[in-house]
Amino acid sequence: MANRNGGFIGTDGLDAPDPVTGVAASGGGASISVSFTAPTDAGTSAITGFVAQASTDGTNYSAGSGTGTSSPITISSLTNGTAYTAKVWAINAYGTSAPSGASSSATPVAPRAVIAIGQANDGSGNKEEIDYFDISTTGNAADFGNLSVLRVAMGSGGGSSTRGMWAGGSGASDVIDYVTIASTGNATDFGNLLSATQGCSSLSNDTRFITGGGSSSPADRIQYVTIASTGNAQNFGDLTKNKAEFYSTANSTRGLWFTKGSGNSNEIEYVTIASTGDGTDFGDMTVECESAAALASSTRAIHGGGSGNKVDIGYVTIASTGNATDFGDLTVGRTRMGGTSSSTRGVFCGGTASPGGVIDYITIASTGDATDFGDMTYTTQYTSPTSAAHGGVQ
C-alpha cells in the first residue's frame, strides 16, 4: 500500500501513489520524451497526473519539466547536445509519490533531416548522394555522404533519433543501410530485407524500422528490424493489398501508408508498430493519386502532392481512424517527393515538377499553404527522407 509523500506537493503521504517504474528517455529536437509505467497502487484516490523532471547532473532535477496524464511525457526547451536523465512523480488528490528511479541518459539533437536524393530530373540518372539540413532553419541542403549501394525508389526512409535508415530500391535491392544522423558520412550496411524489392516504403518509431510493399512478390509484405541492432528483417504481417511506389509515416505508436502507388487511389492504412500483424484500413486521403508524400508529428499525419503534380495537402489525427481533411497547398504541385518532420515543422523535398529541387515547409499544428524552405543539391525525384526528430521519435 502507498505510504509516502515525495515532498513535491500534497499533505497526506499515506494516501499518495506508489512510485512510477520503468522510466526511459529518448532525445528529440530540444526535448526528451519520457516513458514510464504507472504504479499499480494509486493510493486512496485515483492518479490525476504525472510530472517528469530533467537533470544534467543526476542530482538536481530542475533542468526542465513536463506534465501529463499518461506515458510518455515530453520535456521541452532543453539544450541540444546536452545529456539529460529524468525522474517521474505520480500525483493524486492527496499528494505526490516518491520519485521514480532515474532514466538512462538521453540527448536532445537538432532536428536534422537526411534525404537520399533519388533520381535526377535532368536525365543524368540515379544518384547515390544523401543531402541534409536543419529543419528548424530555412535554407539550402548540403551534402551528407553517399548510400552504401546506388539505388532509388525506396519510398520514405525511417530511423531513430540517432540513426537514419533506408531499405530496398531500384534493381530490386534487398539492402538496408543506415547513417548516424549527427555525423556526416557514407551509409553503412545494416542487413537485408526478406527478399529484394523496389518501390517499398518505410516508417519507424524510435525502436522499430518497418518496411511495407514493393514491386516484387509478395508485394503486400510488411517486415521489420530493431533499429539499435544491425541484422536482417523479420516478417511483420501483410498490407491490405499489393502496393508499390508509395510513401509512409508514423508517430511513436502507429505507422501509416498512403495511397498504393499503382493506379490512383486514396487509401490510408495503418499498423500498431509494437505489435506484429496485418495492416488495417484507416480512412481516405483528400485526393486520389499515386506517390503522395507523407510526414507526421506525434499527433498528426500529413500527405502532400501526388501523381498529376497535385498541390493538395491533407491531414489526419493519428489516434483516430477516419478520412483526411484539407490542410492547404504546396508551393508547386509535384509527385515522387518525400516528406519528413521535426516535432513541429514538416518538409517536402524534391519531386517531378520544375524546379524539382524545391523544399517546402509547413507548421504541422496550423493548417495553411506551404512556404518555400530552400533547395536540394540536385533537382531530383524519388527522394527518400528521414530525420532525427520525426513523429515516430517524439
Where do the PLM segments sit?
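Conserved aromatic beta-strand anchor motif in extracellular beta-sandwich/beta-rich domains
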Residues: 49-56
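Short beta-strand segments within Ig-like beta-sandwich modules, predominantly Fibronectin type-III
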Residues: 62-69
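Conserved short beta-strand element of beta-propeller blades
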Residues: 110-117, 146-170, 193-215, 238-262, ...
